[in-house]
């Protein structure tokens, strides 16, 4: 699953003679959803054996590596506390909504310097997380940049209204609440300890960094795969992975 993939990535970064892949037997298997219907090819061990090794970007966050998505804010709190509510995301979400959505954070990087109430920040190298949230649908793990969404302080009612669009990647319709950034570095400071979601794993701290490592890990994929993109004919891009 995604958690095991994250562990493997953390062991493989920096080793040019090592490649990792994803045999999807976990609960979410979010990372490979970016391949659309072709993600089913990852179930075929023979295809993986005959596959191709491609360099993918990773991000470094708080001393750990992530290949997919990291986040800070209410979604990270909901995911971290879900086990306190009998593994119910709904109960965890309701509880955290009543606790309050925004936290006072200072955000720097990608041309932004902001201090104030912040509901959520996601750092995307991949596309899907949390069982199907797709905040930045055209994020690419091989294009040499990270993409970020900063959701500012919003009321509970506004958050409930916007979360559906956030989950579907329609952030451009919410520019009054959400700022989109691109770059290779973002840092967050908080006076209080906050939880950070790193590919589904939780860490805690008062200072959080997201730093790009271009081509940081070799990833094995079935031959001639392309990323899913709903705006292209047939739903798949015509280009292959970027070769480096």
Predicted features along the sequence, with ranges:
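N-terminal small/polar loop signature for handling phosphorylated ligands or for N-terminal nucleophile
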Residues: 1-16
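Hydrophobic structural packing positions in well-ordered secondary structure
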Residues: 2-5, 24, 78, 121, ...
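Short glycine-/acidic-enriched loop or helix-start segments at secondary-structure transitions
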Residues: 7-10, 32-34, 132-133, 160, ...
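Catalytic core of DAGKc-family lipid kinases
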Residues: 13-119
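Glycine-rich phosphate/pyrophosphate-binding beta-alpha loops
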Residues: 71, 75, 122-135, 202
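Short acidic/glycine-rich loop or secondary-structure boundary segments that cap or lie
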Residues: 75-78, 115-117, 128-132, 156-159, ...
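Gly/Ser/Thr-rich active-site loops/lids in small-molecule metabolic enzymes
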Residues: 84-91, 137-158
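ATP/nucleoside-binding phosphotransfer catalytic cores, i.e., glycine-rich phosphate-binding loops
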Residues: 109-110, 115, 140, 150-244
